[in-house]
């Protein structure tokens, strides 16, 4: 929930703008979201971005947290749990991919039975999360392949991957089979999706829609001005970008 608005004000503004779901909702607000008639599109699967799935000594803790959150997600109708690779350590990238995949595989079965997808989030290690391991799409795809479960997929954060590798549309088109969720944000600054930043979100969203993607595109940006107006403008402009786009 953004600091610029109280939770109830934000939820009312989001619904009025036309949004159907709220992303990354902390548990204390779940009832509020449901009472507003909105869906919760994702929540955190486990604690700690830095100490994550790329460390075998963290797997027992993370499995315990994920199993508890899988049960809660099933109870509250939350389709996605966000997971983190953790920061780089002594393991090579290849070794860390195997370790991360093994950690996700430990809980992919219970998650699938509950109708929950485990999202490995791709973050940038250049600006916001120094040392984070899952900082390139290719590494994330390798983890998904190694995990060998249809419900272990990627959270492709457009802002983060623009910083790390660019070539956003072509990457999305190539990797869409392993992407289950998107985050947006203007670059630089993670602010509004407007002309002051470098990403062409109209083209990106149209490309996503053209693939037939049917999951959530969650807006994770910090508005520079009135958050209510930002919500309304973003929903309207994204709708215009998708108008008339036909999936393949």
Which residues are covered by each model-predicted region?
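Histidine-acidic metal/acid-base catalytic patches
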Residues: 1-15, 77-79, 139-156, 160-248
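Active-site-proximal loop/turn and secondary-structure-junction residues that shape catalytic pockets
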Residues: 2, 26-28, 46-49, 87-89, ...
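Catalytic domains of carbohydrate-active enzymes, especially glycoside hydrolases
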Residues: 8-30, 69
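Conserved beta-strand positions in the central sheet of alpha/beta enzyme cores
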Residues: 21-23, 41-44, 82, 119, ...
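Active-site-adjacent beta->alpha loops and helix N-cap segments on the catalytic face
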Residues: 27-38, 91
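Active-site acidic/histidine proton-transfer and metal-coordination neighborhood
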Residues: 52-153, 163, 246-248
């Amino acid at each position: 929930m953004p600091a610029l608005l109280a939770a109830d004000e934000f939820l009312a503004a989001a619904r009025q703008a036309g949004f159907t779901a709220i992303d990354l909702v902390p548990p204390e607000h779940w009832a509020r979201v449901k009472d507003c008639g909105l869906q919760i599109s994702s929540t955190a699967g486990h604690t700690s971005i830095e100490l994550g799935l790329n460390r075998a000594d963290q797997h027992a803790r993370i499995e315990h947290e994920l199993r508890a959150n899988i049960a809660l997600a099933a109870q509250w109708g939350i389709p996605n749990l966000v997971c983190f690779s953790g920061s780089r350590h002594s393991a090579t990238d290849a070794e860390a991919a195997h370790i991360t995949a093994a950690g996700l595989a430990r809980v992919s079965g219970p998650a699938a039975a509950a109708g929950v997808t485990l999202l490995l989030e791709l973050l940038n290690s250049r600006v916001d999360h120094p040392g984070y391991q899952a900082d390139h799409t290719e590494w994330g795809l390798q983890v998904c392949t190694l995990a060998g479960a249809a419900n272990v997929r990627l959270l492709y954060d457009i802002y983060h991957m623009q910083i790390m590798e660019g070539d956003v549309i072509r990457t999305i088109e190539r990797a869409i089979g392993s992407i289950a969720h998107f985050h947006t944000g203007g670059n630089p600054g993670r602010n509004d999706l407007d002309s002051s930043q470098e990403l062409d979100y109209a083209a990106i969203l149209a490309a996503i829609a053209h693939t037939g993607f049917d999951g959530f595109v969650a807006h994770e940006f910090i508005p520079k001005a009135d958050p209510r107006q930002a919500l309304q403008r973003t929903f309207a402009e994204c709708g215009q970008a998708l108008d008339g786009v036909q999936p393949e």
